Amino acid sequence: MLDPLLRRWIDPSLDRAGAWLARRDMSANAFSVAGLAVGLTVIPLLAWGRYDMALLVILLNRLIDGLDGAIARHKGTTPFGGYLDIMCDMAFYAAVPIGFALAQPGNALWAALLLASFVCTASSFLGRAVLA
């Protein structure tokens, strides 16, 4: 519901940054992998109770994820790039409940249920891509 409103505000800036990065021959795939690398640091941060730093990492991951798409739109998308992007995103999404489960083991069941919903979402998304 908020996504269209936020995208209207965020997308122009991401598009300008993506164009600038694309002109400097930056790789959208490299940004996808870098976003995952940054994002995975959320696991120990959450486990150690560093929620302030974890929030910054999550926001940085989302920024990098927005930039990889903007770069791809300027340089041209590829099937592999789309696959890599969604795989890196799903791996990052899984990292967040894992970190919370490590921080509060009593929440492990809820984290597992959330992870199961991510698996179903990813399977549905990738299964639909096979049919397309």
Residue map of PLM features:
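A feature for the membrane-embedded catalytic helix bundles of lipid/isoprenoid biosynthetic enzymes
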Residues: 1-18, 87-132
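A generic membrane alpha-helix/interface feature
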Residues: 43-45, 53, 83-86, 103, ...
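Single, functionally critical "micro-switch" positions that shape active/binding sites
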Residues: 26, 64, 84
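Topogenic membrane-insertion module of multi-pass membrane proteins
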Residues: 1-53
